[in-house]
UniProtKB/Swiss-Prot annotation:
Organism: Loligo forbesii (Veined squid)
Post-translational modification: The N-terminus is blocked.
Its membrane topology: Lipid-anchor
Lipid-substituted positions (S-geranylgeranyl cysteine): 84
GO cellular component, one term: plasma membrane
Protein location: Cell membrane
Gene Ontology terms describing biological process: signal transduction; visual perception
Propeptide: 85-87
Signal sequence extent: none
Family classification: Belongs to the G protein gamma family.
Disulfide-linked positions: none
The protein, known as: Guanine nucleotide-binding protein subunit gamma
Length: 87
């Protein structure tokens, strides 16, 4: 069995020696890895932004936001006359 294992190891070593990766392929692999890292960074940032938005909504409910108001009679009159409203 030891002889068989020795032969297998030699074959594996020979296969590893044959696997020479050209520089172009290395550049491609590195570029893809950098892109993947950039995507994960963007995902992390977007997740933290969502978490911050949720916490803000929890602290400050949006019920108090001022909605469209009814028109004020005095303001409407001054707009028609073109003059200034003096108080």
């Amino acid at each position: 069995m030891n002889k068989m294992q020795g032969k297998k190891k030699k074959k594996e070593e020979e296969e590893e020696e044959e696997r020479i990766i050209p520089p172009e392929l290395w550049k491609l692999i590195i570029e893809q890895y950098k892109r993947q890292l950039a995507k994960t960074d963007v995902m992390k940032v977007s997740e933290t932004v969502k978490l911050h938005e949720e916490k803000i909504k929890e602290k400050v409910p949006t019920d108090h936001i001022i909605h469209a108001q009814k028109p004020n009679a005095w303001v409407e009159e001054t707009k028609k006359s073109g003059g200034c409203l003096l108080v």
